[in-house]
Amino acid sequence: MEEFKRYLDLDTSRQHDFLYPLIFQEYIYALAHDHSLTRSNSLELEKAGYDNNSSLLIVKRLITHLITQMDRQNHLSFLTNDSSQNPFFGHNTALYSQIILEGFVVVVEIPFSIRVISSLDLEGKERVKSHNFRSIHSVFPFLEDKFSHLIYVLDLLIPQSIHLEILIQTLRYWVKDASSLHLLRAFLHKYHNWKNLITPKKSSFSFSKRNKRFFFFFYNFHVYEYESILAFICNQSSHLQSKSYRPFLDRIYFYEKRDHFVEVFTKYFQAVLWSFNDPFMHYVRYQGKALLASKGTFLLMNKWNYYLVNFWQCYFYMWSQPGRIHINKLSNHYLELLGYLSSVGLNSSMVRNQMLENAFLIANASKKFDTTVPIIPLIRSFSKAKFCNLLGHPISKPIWTDLSDSDIIDRFGCIYRNISHYYSGSSQKMSLYRIKYIIKLSCARTLARKHKSTVRAFLKRVGLEFLEEFFLEDEFMFSLTFPKASYISGGLYRMRIWYLDIFCIHDLANHK
């Protein structure tokens, strides 16, 4: 990063093209290959004859030939639709073009990252550790604090299809480098030749998760534009002074949001600000979805629904079906949020009041944000991974019987601890106990099948401690976290605990 920063501090005569020379640096593609390409893509590179001595040279030759074709206005004719093998190079040009895109994203991320670091250094603020904001569980404390006081929620899917030229024009506000943007435009317009990279849709495209670094950067940038305008409207409609704020774009790549909006935004949105005078609007985004909750009326939520659909279509030229947005009442609707079923329910309590000789009961009702374990989807997932049947009855895992006993227990125990760890925030533990029972009995049946015995005979021979010692490791760590657990054990098992070290949800069937 220091090398990049010194390069960007050169004389201003070169700064308008400062990104373009970096595209030809070998360490950019080495960095992209080390951190971005998945294991499957690495295998594809090996099959295509990839090696450290020739790959970077081929990438440079591909860029040079691309520029030549652009100058001749031949529109990348060397990338054909019929074959991914190009006789000019003798290599998979689509694969190396993917490497160029990964390297381009690495280059474009540099000014964003340096801008964030420089702004923090100038203001004398301490850099916040990003991993504290990456946890999936960090969303739920906010929901507990805010959503229990709200009434309606807009459950919407963020459109992922965007017009190419709109994306390039938006990127121009941040990247003052015409040469790099022209190179990017040429690649994007030729993406229909490589169906493994994106899904074509006429003049627009849908982001693909196979090219992960490329996907995350442009998806975050696209959502950033949408959320910036949305935050601007919320601040203006509530008649509050717009303050500096620093939320992050995504929980994987963090770029600072800025509070400097173009003046045209103010003129453009003056006509719609009167419709959204609601100071109790809260917004949460997760996994391509978003929640927009309010204390307002159903009419206000309908206005937001109408505005969002037209905003995506008119400003970003994206078709958004009205059915992608649902208006629900929090009191009688469950939200499928990050593996939990969340709802806002009434928590009633009775208070006995004694005044002189008269005694009477007072009924109090308060709203509470509940998070429960979705037992049916979980059982369906365990059934698909062959841990139980569709009715939830545990079965053995035949594919693991070739492993050693310790490896089998280690795999089941890892799943057991991950489930216990992730669903520690559930307000109802009975469903979680059923899932734990499925894992334990499936482990016992797998071991019994390996030793050609029954579950009863196997456990009688090795003893229950053979499994309990391993599966109770999470409870042991829990007691270390709360030293007084023995005195309030009943209350602790009813508590919801959110962790800041959960970054992803792993597939049960894929153990690494």
From Swiss-Prot:
It is found in: Plastid, Chloroplast. One of its GO terms (molecular function) is RNA binding. This is Maturase K. Keywords: Chloroplast, mRNA processing, Plastid, RNA-binding, tRNA processing. GO terms for biological process: mRNA processing; RNA splicing; tRNA processing. The gene is matK. One of its GO terms (cellular component) is chloroplast. It holds the Pfam family Intron_maturas2. Belongs to the intron maturase 2 family. MatK subfamily. The keyword Plastid applies. The keyword Cytoplasm does not apply. Transmembrane segments: none annotated. Usually encoded in the trnK tRNA gene intron. Probably assists in splicing its own and other chloroplast group II introns. PANTHER family: MATURASE K (PTHR34811:SF1).
